[in-house]
Design a protein with these regions (language model features):
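RNase H-like, Mg2+-dependent phosphodiesterase core
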Residues: 1-70, 77-277
Length: 277
């Protein structure tokens, strides 16, 4: 068997007989490929073990007769500009999504890849875009609680249990369980964190094309030095949170709205599955 054929074989699922044959092959190229193959298997086994641990909360509820468990997380509580995005995700009981983790621990490219896989595999997904107006009206904590309750009530498949990243929430006809660092401990919450983060990043990238002076594509609405300088020079857009300092103290008139805005800073929006800027 040629080395190229061995490589192709080991990319698949070789039989035990084929592996024995390759182990007896003294060619260094074959042995290197075998070593790489076993390392890959070990890495895959470790990832499956890690993912299984991330399903511990969900499996405990399923073992007690619960039919559906949702995970809930948000993106955008801290920025000076842009909406708050909240996502709820129900994963299949037998789900396996390699690399799933807290969105903050992942690169943008990895989040985008996982976003697509979550969309493809999830039982149900709901996204709630909480408006800047409601953030300013209710304060960010209350707006988050309110938005999380709403995203659960709008889920097309209703869960009996909702696992929520650190936030105490009350929603109709379900048990809501806050979990500190839940996005690193629960697969469902981690999936929700990725959906929320990718969705919000795409919104901010869209807003960057409409308000290019503020660097939204890069700062995602956080108060970087360049962002603060732009506010001082050009004023605050209607996407800036007037209840957040230092914008609150600046008392600036809003920049004129763009004619082709895709989202509203005054109205909450609900989306099932995905939002593409």
């Amino acid at each position: 068997m040629k080395i190229s054929e061995v490589k192709e074989l080991l990319l698949g699922n070789p039989s035990s007989e084929q592996l024995k044959m390759l182990q007896a092959d003294e060619r260094s190229g074959v042995q290197k490929l075998l070593t790489a193959y076993y390392k890959r298997l070990e890495k895959e086994a470790q990832e499956k073990e890690r993912f299984t641990k991330m399903l511990a909360y969900e499996r405990e509820y399923y073992a007690h007769g619960v039919q559906y468990v949702a995970g809930v997380d948000e993106a955008g509580r801290g920025p000076l500009a842009g909406p708050l995005v909240i996502a709820a995700v129900i994963l299949p009981r037998n789900a396996f999504i390699a690399g799933l983790n807290d969105s903050k621990q992942l690169s943008a490219a990895k989040r985008d890849k996982l976003y697509d896989e979550i969309i493809a595999k999830a039982v149900a997904i709901e996204v709630n875009i909480v408006s800047v107006s409601n953030i300013d009206k209710y304060n960010i904590y209350a707006a988050t609680q309110r938005g999380m309750a709403q995203v659960l009530e709008h889920l097309p498949v209703q869960p009996q249990v909702a696992l929520i990243d650190a936030m105490p929430v009350t929603a109709k006809n379900m048990e809501c369980v806050p979990i500190v660092h839940g996005d690193a401990l629960s697969a469902s919450i981690a999936a929700a964190s990725i959906i929320a983060k990718v969705t919000r990043d795409r919104i901010m990238e869209r807003l960057d094309t409409l308000f290019p002076d503020y660097g939204f594509a890069h700062n995602k609405g956080y108060g970087s030095g360049a962002h603060m300088q732009a506010i001082a020079e050009f004023g605050a857009t209607k996407w800036h949170r007037r209840s957040y300092e230092p914008v609150k103290s600046m008392q600036l008139e809003p920049v004129a709205a763009a004619d082709n805005e895709l989202y509203s800073p005054q109205l909450d929006c609900h989306y099932v599955f995905s939002i593409d800027a």
